[in-house]
Curated annotation (Swiss-Prot):
CDD domains: NEAT. Gene3D superfamilies: 2.60.40.1850. Cell wall-anchored surface receptor that participates in the extraction of heme from oxidized methemoglobin/metHb to enable growth on hemoglobin as a sole iron source. Receives heme from IsdB and transfers it to IsdC. Also plays a role in the inhibition of host immune response. Protects S.aureus against the bactericidal protease activity of apolactoferrin. Decreases bacterial cellular hydrophobicity, which renders S.aureus resistant to bactericidal human skin fatty acids as well as to beta-defensins and cathelicidin. It is a peptidoglycan-anchor. The gene is isdA. It comes from Staphylococcus aureus. This is Iron-regulated surface determinant protein A.
Length: 354
């Protein structure tokens, strides 16, 4: 007899059980991942909603103006301080928002305040709204609609303190230190588009001034003519002596002409040196001006590329919903792939079992 572990039926059963375990494990992993991703997406949505709420509150507060004001709660019909004054934080605030005035006060032990109403001098009830209700600190912030010029408010409250079995209704009057003042409107940010600086066009360099070449007057050699007195001499000279005199005068003339030519060359050389030096200095000045202008143009172009400052951009609210949609799509795709794989494995098992 063959052993049980060599039997084909036993092997197929073992394979099917192993495949069942694998499919159950993959299914549990998929379900766990879906639960985790769903919780993560909920946390992300909650965080984005919180940031949106804080941004909206900041914009609302920025549009309102406020000013602190002192007050005292006194007993009805007298100027004596009431116990109710100890259950309110000092000082209060006068707030102007959307062209409406509010007196803002913070109530301590808010759980004791079962009812509170405020009236003006004409015994007209004023609208009250709860701005913030902090259960942990047991405080409550309220806004009472007022008008500029109010000096006092009449209050009717219902206080219940269960620890001491205190349950009482009474009337007081709230006296301001000064009348409700008028407040200026909050300065709204002007959405002014930043002016983009135009790139400065480089100025065309001025035409190079040609160096003025000084005019050099040619010095003519002075030729000494023989004096008339020599011609007037009546003495006769021998022809040999006359020829000697003529040779001497010609040599003197040649010496004088060579000296004048040398002097002229000496005068012309320093003049040329001065002219060349001036032309070189002018050329250097023009090249320096060109380099400075090109540097200015490049700097202005870099500033223009950088664009306007970030301080003029308004605060943008974070984009909500995109991350949750992406997570949902990815999870659905992953789940469908896992299901298709498990179905294919089951079909394969059934074929083998047949």
């Amino acid at each position: 007899m063959t052993k049980h572990y060599l039997n084909s039926k036993y092997q197929s059963e073992q394979r099917s059980s192993a495949m069942k375990k694998i499919t159950m494990g993959t299914a549990s992993i998929i379900l766990g991942s879906l639960v985790y991703i769903g919780a993560d997406s909920q946390q992300v949505n909650a965080a984005t909603e919180a940031t949106n709420a804080t941004n909206n509150q900041s914009t609302q507060v920025s549009q309102a103006t406020s000013q602190p004001i002192n007050f005292q709660v006194q007993k009805d019909g007298s100027s004596e301080k009431s116990h109710m004054d100890d259950y309110m934080q000092h000082p209060g605030k006068v707030i102007k928002q959307n062209n409406k005035y509010y007196f803002q006060a913070v109530l301590n032990n808010a759980s004791f305040w079962k009812e509170y109403k405020f009236y003006n001098a004409n015994n007209q009830e004023l609208a009250t709204t709860v701005v913030n209700d902090d259960k942990k600190a047991d405080t409550r912030t309220i806004n009472v609609a007022v008008e500029p010029g109010y000096k006092s408010l009449t209050t009717k409250v219902h206080i219940v303190v269960p620890q001491i079995n205190y349950n009482h209704r009474y009337t007081t009057h709230l006296e301001f230190e000064k009348a409700i003042p008028t407040l200026a409107d909050a300065a709204k940010p002007n959405n002014v588009k930043p002016v983009q600086p135009k790139p400065a066009q480089p100025k065309t360099p001025t035409e190079q001034t040609k160096p003025v070449q000084p005019k050099v007057e040619k010095v003519k050699p002075a030729v000494t003519a023989p004096s008339k007195n020599e011609n007037r001499q009546t003495t006769k000279v021998v022809s040999s002596e006359a020829t000697k005199d003529q040779s001497q005068t010609q040599s003197a003339r040649t010496v004088k002409t060579t000296q004048t030519a040398q002097d002229q060359n000496k005068v012309q050389t320093p003049v040329k040196d001065v002219a060349t030096a001036k032309s070189e200095s002018n050329n250097q000045a023009v090249s320096d001006n060109k380099s400075q202008q090109t540097n200015k143009v490049t700097k202005q172009n870099e500033v223009h590329k950088q664009g306007p400052s970030k301080d003029s951009k308004a605060k943008e609210l974070p984009k909500t919903g995109l991350t949750s949609v992406d997570n949902f799509i990815s999870t659905v795709a992953f789940a469908t792939l896992a299901l298709l794989g498990s179905l294919s494995l089951l079909l394969f098992k059934r074929k083998e079992s047949k």
